Structures are given as C-alpha cells and as structure tokens.
Amino acid sequence: MEEIPIKVAVRIRPLLCKEVLHNHQVCVRDIPKTQQIIIGRDRVFTFDFVFGKNSTQDEVYSTCIKPLVLSLIEGYNATVFAYGQTGSGKTYTIGGGHVASVVDGQKGIIPRAIQEIFQSISGNPNIDFKIKVSYIEVYKEDLRDLLELETSMKDLHIREDEKGNTVIVGAKECQVDSVEDVMGLLQVGNAARHTGTTQMNEHSSRSHAIFTISVCQVGKSAEATEDGEWCSHRHIVSKFHFVDLAGSERVTKTGNTGERFKESIQINSGLLALGNVISALGDPRRKSSHVPYRDAKITRLLKDSLGGSAKTVMITCVSPSSSDFDESLNSLKYANRARNIRNKPTLNFSPQADRMDEMEFEIKLLREALQSHQASISQTSQTASENVPDQNRIHSLEEQIAQLQEECLGYQDCIEQAFAFLVDLKDAVRLNQKQQHKLQQWFSRTQEVRKAVLTPLPGNQSIGNLEEGPQHVTVLQLKRELKKYQCALAADQVVFTQKELELEELRRQMQLMAQESKGHAVSLKEAQKVNRLQNEKIIEQQLLVDQLSEELAKRSSSMPTSTKESCGDGPDARAPEKRPHTAPFDSHWGHYVYIPSRQDFKKVCSSSPVYSLDQVFAGFRTRSQMLMGHLEDQDEVLHCQFSDNSDDEDSEGQEKPRVRSRSHSWVKKPGSVCSLVEMSDTQAECQRSYLGNGDLKMESLQESQELNLQKLRTSELILNKAKQKMRELTINIRMKEDLIKELIKTGDNAKSVSRQYSLKVTKLEHEAEQAKVELTETRKQLQELEGKDLSDVALKVKLQKEFRKKMDAAKLRVQVLQKKQQDSKKLASLSIQNEKRASELEQNVDHLKYQKVQLQRRLREESEKKKQLDAEVKRDQQKLKELQLNAGQGEGLHPKAEDTDAFNLNRRKGPFRSVDQLQKLDEQRKWLDEEVEKVLSQRQELEMLEEELKKREAIVSKKEALLQEKSHLENKKLRSSQALSTDSLKISARLNLLDQELSEKSLLLENSPTEEKVKISEQVQALQREREQLQRQRNSVDEKLRHGRVLSPKEEHLLFQLEEGIEALEAAIEFKNESIQNRQSSLKSSFQNLSQSESNVLEKLVCLNIAEIRAILFKYFNKVINLREAERKQQLQNKEMKMKVLERDNMVHELESALEYLRLQCDRRLTLQQKEHEQKMQLLLHHFKDQDGEGIIETLNKYEDKIQQLEKDLYFYKKTSRDLKKRLKDPVQGAVQWQRTLTEHHDAGDGVLNPEEAAVLSEELKWASRTENTKLNGREKEVDNSSSSLKTPPLTQQILEDGPDSLPVCGSLAPSSGQLQSSADKTEAHAFTQSQSPPPPQLQPVRSIAQLQGVKPVKVCRRELRQISALELTLRRSSLGAGVRSVTADSLEEPEES
C-alpha cells in the first residue's frame, strides 16, 4: 500500500470558569467552515480536522476515530494519541478518566470505540473474533502493567517481533467477550493510574498511558468454491492503541515541588524526545537523518505509529487562554510538522501463514473423520457381534484374493517382460538347437496361456477376460467407496434440508421485519411532519420574543429625560432625571434586574407590533452576526465541562444577550420628589413598583430555571450510576447463582463419595481390628519363640526376623488404615461444609436481589423526579415567554401612576418649599455614583494593564535569557570556527615544513652511503606517516569549516530549539504589546474624561462654599471606592470557592463510583475463583469415585510422567513443524514442474491427463510429500487394518514414469517403466509403497491399466462413477490416506492462536 500522511486534528477547549472570572482573553480561534485555526493576530495553521470550543465528543469521534475502527476490523493497525500541554483536555477527549461516573454524552473516544468494535463484531457472524485488552503505563520512564499490578517493572520489556512490530513482553492480555468486560478493565486501569493535583489541573495525568485492543479474526468455516479452488479462511490480527500522553508542564505555573517536580522532569523529557521524533520525521530537510526512537520509551512504543505501518490520528488539544499563548503556539507547530509524517499501512494478513493454518485445519478435520470412522466401525462391530467371525473370515479371504491377484499381475508382468526380452534375445544371439527348442516350447506355452486367459469361462461372468481380472479389486473398492459416499451424501442432504428450513424461517422473519419497517417509516414521516410544524411555530414565537427583548433593551439604553410636574411649580415643573445606580454583582451568573422607564411603556403599547416574515428573518440574520462577534469578545462559560446538552446551550445562548444588556444598562427607577418628602404613601409606592415586581418575578423564574437545570444534570448522573450498578449487580447475582449450582453439585458428589467412604470406613475399621489381632498373635509367637531353647541358632534367628518383619508390616498397615480412616472422615465432612457455604451464598444472593429491588425503586423515583424537573423547566420557560410577551401590557398602568404622582406633588406643594434642594441632592447623589463607577472601571483597567505588563516583562526576561544562551552558543560557534581556521593554518605550515624535510631527506638518501641509507629511510617513513596524519586532520578541519559543523549535534539541536523558543516568545510579546496598546488607548480616553470630571467636581464643590461638606464628600467618596473594591474581591473569591467546592463534589462522586465498581469487581473475581475451586473439587471427587480412593498417588504420578512425555513430544513436533515449513516450498515447485511435464505429454497426444486432473494430482503430490516427510522423521505409526483398503499411494514417480512409450503398440508388450528410475528412487518408492495398503488400480502406472490395444484406462470409468468434484474427492482420499495412521493428536496440529 502507498504511503499516506497521518491525520492531525486540533481541538480547542472552552475557557474554564476560573479563566472567565479572571477575564482571560481568547487568543486561539477557529475559522468557521474551514479547517484552519488562528492564534494571535495573524498566525494561521491548516489541519485535517479542527474542532472549536463548542464541539461535542460525538463529533470528534465520528469525524476522526470511526474510520480507524473500520480499518481495525479490516485488518490494519490503528493509533490515536492526544498531545498538548497540561490541562488542555487530552484525558477528557481520549476518555481515560472515571468512565463509570460520566454521562453518555460526555464519554470519550475509548468507550465509543469499544461499543463500535462490538457492534461490528455482531454484524459479522461468519467470522470468529477474539478480543484481547492490555493497559500499560509509562511512569518515570518505567513500564507498569495497570491490569496486573503485581507484575514487576523489571519483567516488562519492549521488543520487536519477527515481523518488526513493537511488542511489550510480560504485559498481561485479558480476553474479553462484551463491552462491560472491557469497560471494567478500563476502569480498573484508570483507578491504578498515577494522577495528581497541580495549580493548573485538579486531575493531572502524571504518566503516559497506552490502552491496546487486539482483534483476532478467523473464518468459522472453509469450503470448496464452485470453480474448484479451495477457499481459505483468513487469519488476521490487528491492534488499536489509544495513547493518553501526559501534558507538558512549567514549574512556574504548576508550582510542583518534591515528587511532583521529579515527575515533571520525566514527563518533559519524554515529550521532548517525542518532539524530536516528530521534527525528524516531519522536517523534509532531515529526511536522511537518524530518527531518535530510542531516546525515550514512549517514542519506542509509538514507533509503528509514527513513520510505521499503522493508521494514525494525532489529536492536539490547545487552551484558548492568552496566558497559555506560547505553549499553544508550540503545540500547533509540532502538530503542523506531524502532518508531514507519512506511514505505510499494511494489512496484517499473510497468505503463506494462512495456508499453513489451513493445512493444519485440514489435518484436524481428517483426524476427526478418522476417529468418527473408527467409532462407526467399532459401533457396527458391537451391534453385530455374532457375525464377527464370518465377517473376519470374509475379510481375510478378500485380502488373500486381492493379494493373490496382485501377485498374479506381478508374475504376468514379469512374463511379459521376459517374453519381450527373449524375443529380442532370439534375434540378437545365436543359440544351439536345444536352446532354440526350449525357447520355442516356452513361446508356445505362453501363447496357449494367453488364449486361455482371453477366452471367457462359462458360468463366471465376473472374470471374463484379462481386463476384468486385475480390476476386480478396484471394483470392490469402488463399491465400498460408493456406499460410503452415498452415506455421506445422505447426511449432507439432511443438513441441507435443515439449512433450507432455517433459511425459509429467516426469509419469513425478514418479510415481517420489512413490513414493520414500512409501518415505522410511515409513522416516522408523520412524526417528522408534526415536529416540523411545531419547530416552525417555536421559531416564530422565539423570533417574536427576541424582537420584543431587543426593543426593551433599546428603550432601556436610550434613557430620555422625562418631564414631570413638580410640587412647587405646578403642572409644568420637571421631574429630576433618573439616576444611574450600580447594581451588586449577582451570584447567579450575572443576572441583573432591569426596570424600564415610563415613556418606554408608552411607546411600546401605542401600537401592536406587526412584522412581515422577510423583516423577521432579516433581523434574525443581522442579530446573529452581531451576537457572534459579541460572544467571541465577551465569552461566558457557565460550567467547566464540555456539554452535549444542546437544549441547555440554546437556552443559555438566548439568555446571554439579555444578561449582558442588563448588566451594562442596569438603571434603577428613582422615586419622585414627593416620595422623598413623604415615605408613608404606600399606594404610590405600590403603583410605582408594579413593573419592578414583574421583573423581579422574571428574575426569580430564571433563577429557578437554572436551579432546575442543575438538578436535572445531577439526576442524570444518579440515573446513570444506578443503571451501572444494576448491571453489575445482575452480573454478580448470575455468577453467584452459578456458584451455588456448582456447590450443590459438589455437595451431591461429596454425599455419594461420603456414603461410599462410610462403607469403606467400616471396612477399614474391621481390617484394622484384624491387623491388630494379627499383630498381637505375632507378638505372642515371637515371645514363645524367644522363650524356647532351640538347638539350631540359625533357625531361631531366621524365625525371629520373619516375625519381626510381620510385626513391622502389621504396624505399617495399621498406620495406613488409620490415615485412610481420617481422610475418609474429612471427605465425609466436605458435604456439610458445602451446604453451609451454599446457604451463606443464598443469603448473599438474597441480599443482592434486595439491593437490586431497592435500586429499581430508586431508579423509578429518579425517573419520575427527572420528568418533574423537565416539566418544571418547560413550565418556567413558558412563564418567561409569557412575562416577556406581556411586559408591554403592564405599561398601560404607567399613565395612571404618573397622574397619581402628579396629584401627590400638587397636593404636597403647599407645606414644603425646598423641592429645589431635594432635586439638587438627587443630582449630587447621581453624579457621585457616576464618578465612583468611573474610578472603579479606571482602577480595574489599570490592574489589568499592570498584569499584562508583568506578563510581558516575564516573557521579555525569558526571551533575554534565551537570547543570551543563543549568543553564547553563537560566540562559541564563532570561536570554534576561528580556532579551527587557526589550526588549519598551523597544520598547513607544518605540512609545508614536512614537505621540505622530505625533499631534503630524499636528496640525502641519494647521496649518502649504504650504512646511513637505512636510518634516513626510517626517518623518511616517520615523516611520511606524520604528513599523512596531518593531512587527515586538515581535511577533517576543512570539512567542518566548509559545512559549518563547528558545534556538536547536541549543541546544534539546542540552538535550533532556542531559535524556535525565541520565535514563539516574540509572537507572544507581539500579542501582549497589541493588547497593552489597546488598553493604553482606552485608558487615555478614560483619563481625559476623568480629568474633566475632576475639574467639574472641584467647580461644583467650590460653589457649595461649605468646607465641612467638601471634607465629608471626599471621605465618602474614598470609603465608597474601598468598599466597592472589597465587595468585588469578595464576590470573586466566593465564586472561586463555589467552583472548587463543585469540583471537589464531582471528585468525591467519581471516587465513590469507582470504589463501588471496584468492590463489585473484587466480588466478581472472588466468585470466579470459588467457581473454579468447586470445579476442581468435582474433578477430584470424580477421580475418588472412579478409582474407589485407591491409586490416586499412582494416577498423579502417571499424569506427571505423561505431561513430561507430552512436553518432549511438543518440543519435537515444534522442531519438526519448523523444518516442514522450510521444506514446504520444494514440493510446491516440484508440483509446478510436474504439471508442465504433464502438459507436454498431453500436447504430444498421449491422453494421459488433462490440466484439471494435473491440478488434482498436484494436490495429491503435496499430501504424499508430507506423509513421506513424516515417515522419514521416524514418527510413523502402524497402519490401521480396518481402513487400509482406502489408502491413496503417492503419485510422484508413477505418473512421471509413464510416457508416450508406456502404452502397448501393435500387441507388443511395453518395457517396464521402472527402467527409467534410478536405484535410489526405486528403493524409496518401494519402501513407501510397502508402508501403504494395496493401491487402487486407477492410480497404478499406465502399463498396468492399458496392456491390450483398444482398452480404455480405468480412470475414465472412475470419473464416470464419481458424483462429486475432483478436488473434493482428492482431498477426501488423501484425508483417508493420511488419517489411517493412528498418530496421537498434539497441540501443534490444532489451529494456532496468535
């Protein structure tokens, strides 16, 4: 397959709540409808996939990972790895966190890929899949098995297999059968993974993790195709690596110390090695350079993924915050380089290996067929036991007849050869008269025998001529084969009828499903139509609501001065202007109360709004464009996690413009002058606060809606947790029920064994009593013998020894019987123990079922609660819409309220004459509040500017440090080049001196005498050696100066990294300068306004002419500023604490769910171990029961000896298999040459074989060669007599020997084809033929088939009798030939599992 570049995706996470609170700017944006990303002002990068901050997990998976899963099923290796700085969302994207406590919408890549893989497996029923899982962690450059924590790090090694793939030796691979098994292993591994808390991330990954899924797929059946070729099942093993890299860290930001600091060093070193590999592979200038895979273990593990044979996707996660600008820029640069890396994916399918597997599978089938054949023969012999002698006699007679006929044919062949030889000899050699007479008698006798054989005998039609004689055995064999094949055909017909019935049932089910699908399609269309109508209505209502909200916002922002009647000046007096009032920051995400003015209500209610559809959509598009820019400038994040709840996002997106309009234009409606004069007038206050109460009601509805949404999310988490626990409990209950069944079964076996052993105990007790009696009698006899005085001392000693032996034997027997009695009692008590354990397990199962019932009840309650919350949210949304639509109707009350205010002013104007003073007081308060707001905003801008300046100073200092280091390296490079040039000059001068000395020495050598010539020649040789060494030094120095290789490779690489770091810092400084300039320009304008306001303040305060008021006002002003600033800081801290509390609660929930999951997993593993123990106990009891408790030790010893023998056989067969695999190519090449020979014979007009039959015989050649190899290795077994007549001999020499001269011509007998063979070939063919049964005539040489003219070959008759294909017949015949040998099946002859 051709090389393809790896796919690179970039995902931008949204701003975190903490970043939003601290007003971090967004420096990374994606360009909509393109695969480009902008960082800073003008840096644009293009990638294969770009996902913005609103992207969902499903979008990332379906776009990037789903094609990789399909490639995995096809047989390719795949890899996905997440790259980026710490806290950028890598673990969240990959899905390596707490998977048990995550809702379905937020699941990462790994859970979704697992579900996709098992769905693909269920869709391929014709393929047998085996899934294995491993989970490895690279922590501090040490490998760690997360699925087997007891495995030592020293036992895990990175190696390369015979195919060049990187593997981890010693890692545990767990075979799984369902999604739940994989998720359980993933959860176990995630719980054991190293994580920690830093200042940048609460759940920071402290190691690299690699989760590998291995898929092995094998075809379930292998059948012959219609064209006669063998259809081999493919054996494919593919792997999918999910790599979660640890993020790059900076100690200044993370604040790591101690152990965390050491972890950061190791993480950064591994990522640096990975960056070097990406640079070496992705930089076209470094194509020929060495790729440093061995610098770190993570790069060694990713060798196949980067520049190897796998399909790879790299997901780069970046942070949009301006504080992470340089890290994001470096990550994007590495991702851009990675796009130049090219892999060469290869399919993990080897036809040669699969051919070997196919052959091993065929051997297995043949052995099974042989065993079934032998079983049928044994069954037939059992059913017809009375006819066995007759059948054996008939069988022996048939074998004798076949042997005699074969001998007859052999003699006949010899006679024919001798006849031809004597005919030639008669003409060539002169014989005497007596010899000629004997030869003539022999010729006449031979002719008479021929005529007698050719003449048909009366009453015997079966042997009518010479042709039928040698073929009698063939007819018998063909009849047997025909009967056997008819039985096989009948069995196949039964299978075919069953399959047809199943197919008919499936067709009927498909028809029913098609009808159901049609009905569903009709109902779906109707539902879509209704949904479309409802959506159109909702869109129209929402457009109307948005239009009204914008009108209200416009009215609130205009704030016109209204004229009112004053109390002292009559109806033409003007009311004071509305005073802007700063509202406190609300704790519920910035919702403010907005109270419109009275004139706005008049304008809104003057006429009902009527809009055309075009105007509505035009306004909607305009508002959308404005809102997009506004949202990008002032983005607000309401929760830290990525949200897949589209309804929530829509509702929040609709609320954001209104929230901001209220926060920026919040105006409190002041009371009139009369309200300041008389505060006891409740009627006027109620009328003026009518709309205020309506807005407060709207605010409370919004707060309740947010609270309900939060409750809804919590309810979803609880529901998912309960469902997960229910699934786990169901599995545990099922496993415990199976364990109870095993315990009951073990108890029953134990009871039967205990009954058996109770009888045995009584028997043993009786034997023990007898042994004791014998012992006492023997002691008495011994004492009597010692008491007697025997004259023969030798006899006495002999009798004493015999009695002592008897006593020792009796004591030993008593001890053995007592031990057996104790063992029998222990076995008898086993059933009681099993009953106790079974009762305990039943109680445990009842408890689990009770928990399941409680969970189901809780699940129903949570479902009802969720439904209620959904209804409340919808009801609140409806109420909000109604309040927004009916807001204009309340404005009709304002004229009435305004008249009431005027009446109250007119009524109160008599007693009070200081209305102007009150108005001035209101104006002063309003003015002071405005000045306070200006100063606060000014101070906030100044603080942000100071922060930006500090960040810029830090970046500049870092840049200066890098520049210093770069200048140091450049100076070193310059000094080195100067030193090299100086050395070159010195070497050149020295070379010139050496040339002069050599010339002088050569002259001296010519003129010097013979004695001095030796010394001078030695000096000349030394000078020449020095000259050559200096010449090499000068060449190396010149080469370094020419190519600029002054520094070491490490220093060159460091210089390259410094240049890149300086470039990134310059870009960050440029971005900071731009933001600082913007802030400075805004501050300049605000400073000007502030200076003008200060002059106005001074003028107004001077006009007051009261020193006390001036001092009070300044104190009040400073106090208000300090209080407001402290309040703002308090609110900021409060929100930060709330976020931390929320994060801690989420962490506690995750840990609790993980703990519960691990507890259930431990219980499950314990149950499995108990079940295995009970099965072993059953096997042990079965052995006790079968062997009656005797010979257990002997049986175990036999088993151990057998295991050792099998291990030896296994080693031998492995070696033999390797040798046969190497020698497999030779028979294939011989078969090809043999086919060419047959084709040449066919072209010559022999009529020996056609190409189709040649292909058939080539298959038989392979089987014959394999059988011969087995025989030569000394592993041949004896031939089974029951099926020896069905064997197939090898055709290697027989067919090749037959040529055009093998057929009889003009009645003469052809010479023997054995003359064409060498002596070695004859010996080998003869030995192999003797090891086989008598061959069928159709496979004999052509000379034995066509000895007379006009006789057709027997193979034509065989083809007419056969009703199956030639290939299948050949395979079955070869299977019978290869399967007759009683060779014990070993593990190597089973299909290997890789």
UniProtKB/Swiss-Prot annotation:
Coiled coil spans = 352-418, 493-554, 709-980, 1010-1078, 1118-1152, 1187-1226
Supply one GO molecular-function term.
ATP hydrolysis activity
**What GO terms fall under cellular component here?**
cilium; cytoplasm; extracellular region; kinesin complex; microtubule
Return the Basic and acidic residues bias intervals. 571-580, 1267-1280
Where do the record's region annotations for Disordered lie? 551-583, 642-664, 1267-1340, 1375-1394
* Location(s), subcellular: Cytoplasm, Cytoskeleton; Cell projection, Cilium
Q: Which UniProt keywords apply?
A: ATP-binding, Cell projection, Cilium, Cilium biogenesis/degradation, Coiled coil, Cytoplasm, Cytoskeleton, Microtubule, Motor protein, Nucleotide-binding, Phosphoprotein
Q: Which residues bind ATP?
A: 84-91
As stated in the Swiss-Prot or TrEMBL entry, residues carrying the post-translational modification Phosphoserine are 643, 646, 672, 675, 704, 999, 1365, 1387
List each copy of the Kinesin motor domain by range: 5-341
Single biological process term from Gene Ontology: establishment of localization in cell
The UniProt family comment states:
Belongs to the TRAFAC class myosin-kinesin ATPase superfamily. Kinesin family. KIF27 subfamily.
Question: How is this protein organized at the quaternary level?
Answer: Interacts with STK36.
> What function does the entry list?
Plays an essential role in motile ciliogenesis.
| PANTHER family per UniProt | CHROMOSOME-ASSOCIATED KINESIN KIF4A-RELATED (PTHR47969), KINESIN FAMILY MEMBER 27 (PTHR47969:SF30)
Q: State the name under which the record lists this protein.
A: Kinesin-like protein KIF27
Which gene name belongs to this protein?
Kif27
